[in-house]
Amino acid sequence: MKTYLRMGWLGFFLTLLLTSANLQAQEIPDPKIYDAVQWRLVGPFRGGRADGVTGVKGSGHSYYFASTGGGIWKTVDSGRTWKSVSDGFFGGSMGAVAVSESDTAVVYAGGGEKTVRGNVSFGYGVWKSKDAGKTWVRAGLDKSRFISRLRIHPTNPDVVYAAVLGDIFKPDATRGVFKSVDGGKTWEKVLFVSDVAGAVDLVLDPKKS
């Protein structure tokens, strides 16, 4: 009887071990499944250069992009249709857009594109929406000219960082990295190298930001 029990327990542990190994193997997707995937245009037609793109946490269908010639655009159907959500509030060149992870109704947009070329257009600071792009208000850094990236704290939508390239045609003291802790009402310059060195990107450590 003891022999049967031992064999039974041995079989149980072997089954558990094999099942666990199978589950671990299933967690790693086979790279070959992506071989057939092809890029496709999702619009909008003549939307201009897309200088900033972001998704919405918890939604696989909602996205925003910052157009260098047409403001901020939004889709809620994975790119089948797009709508300009900045018309009537601001327009022209936009270089950055970010959606809060903790409150997806909060969206920040930054003016001016970061792709330096002969015919770039500057922007007029940061804009903020509290209703997922339906309405917008100014949120500071009006003289920043070219905002390259916006990053929002993962748990506090009032804490936001801006990478500012500044005026690309001349030395400019409005360059570097800026931080706001009150939703864009006030900004503090937290990194400045020189008036000829701007910031073009930002990555946040969620535990130290």
Locate predicted features.
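N-terminal secretory signal peptides that target proteins for export/translocation
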Residues: M1-R6
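Bacterial N-terminal signal peptides
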Residues: G8-S20
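Sec/Tat signal peptide C-region and signal peptidase I cleavage site
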Residues: A21-A25
